[in-house]
């Protein structure tokens, strides 16, 4: 019998890390889109309508991102965290799968061994609930969205939850708040 070793790090803790506004500077990305040759035509749309237009453009192939094109939108501490934790991290992202996949694959180009869960329009806690037991005791979930944090709390009670506040503002108060992934205390 032959075994392949993919990583020498023993995974003791599993981290589920949100992509937009937790690992990826979505607000700067939206500003960048205003100058993008394809996406720029949608620049005046409010964010919900912008998302619909971008989803359609990715789906029909008129909008794509080159490998690494979006890597500078990955928060610096997020890149270090992902490289350090390797197989102990799963990115998890909500929203149109084609657009999310295009952003994630471009932003993470060059960072090996990172898995991503695309939940589509299913809330992250609801998506993970049937499978959370596979990830050991007390997996960690980090997100900036209150609805995602609440859903995780309601559907996956054993998960340790952190609220990400990249703006340094006060959190909701129900969970520990961090502004950098390096501040995770677990």
Language model feature labels by segment:
Residues 63-90, 122-129:
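Short, acidic loop-to-helix structural element flanking the phosphoryl-transfer center
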Residues 50-65, 103-111:
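Short, basic/glycine-rich phosphate-binding loops at helix/coil junctions
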Residues 85-90, 94-119:
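Substrate-recognition/cap helix-loop segment adjacent to the acidic, metal-dependent catalytic center
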Residues 22-24, 38-50, 73-75, 91, ...:
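Solvent-exposed loop/turn and edge beta-strand elements of beta-rich ligand-binding domains
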Residues 6, 10-55:
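Active-site neighborhood of HAD-like aspartate-dependent phosphohydrolases
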Residues 6, 10-13, 105, 109-141, ...:
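Asp-based, Mg2+/Mn2+-dependent phosphohydrolase catalytic module
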Residues 22, 97, 147:
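Conserved Rossmann-like nucleotide-cofactor binding loop
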């Amino acid at each position: 019998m032959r075994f392949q070793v993919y990583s020498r790090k023993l995974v003791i803790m599993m981290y589920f890390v949100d992509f937009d506004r937790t690992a990826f500077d979505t607000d700067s990305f939206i500003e960048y889109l205003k100058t993008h040759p394809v996406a720029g035509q949608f620049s005046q749309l409010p964010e919900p309508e912008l998302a619909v237009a971008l989803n359609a453009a990715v789906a029909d192939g008129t909008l794509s991102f080159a490998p690494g094109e979006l890597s500078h939108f990955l928060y610096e501490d997020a890149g270090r965290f992902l490289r350090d934790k390797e197989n102990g991290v799963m990115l998890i992202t909500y929203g149109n799968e084609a657009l999310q996949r295009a952003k994630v694959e471009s932003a993470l180009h060059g960072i090996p061994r990172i898995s991503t869960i695309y939940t589509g329009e299913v809330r992250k806690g609801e998506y993970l609930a049937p499978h959370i037991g596979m990830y050991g005791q007390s997996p960690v979930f980090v997100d900036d969205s209150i609805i995602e944090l609440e859903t995780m709390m309601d559907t996956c009670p054993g998960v340790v939850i952190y609220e990400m506040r990249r703006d340094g503002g006060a959190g909701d108060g129900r969970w520990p708040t961090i502004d950098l992934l390096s501040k995770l205390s677990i």
